[in-house]
């Protein structure tokens, strides 16, 4: 988490309307520092800003058909920094798509719907609980 106690979230989606509505929901409901990106490439170029969480669209095919899709972007993010939690978003509710994302080391997979924001909030809360437990475990392991 960032020093100013704001959670830095990267939102990556080629659907400008969905991206803006999600950004507004985050800014209205909690103390987040939000950066939005229309392509995976733009997100990758900004990883030096150290996001706490990345919320990434599965397809990313609306703006440039030759751009990286969500899975390719996820793989690049994990190659650069495996510890950044990435939540995948998609309009697809197919289980094989969700499983594929999890195999590529996504933290969670959420279907775009009217409840997506609530599910994202819960996933973010889970991420920070998990990270706290990891730190405690590391602390105990160091003392063994």
PLM regions and their residue ranges:
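Receiver (REC) domain switch/output surface
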Residues: 119-132
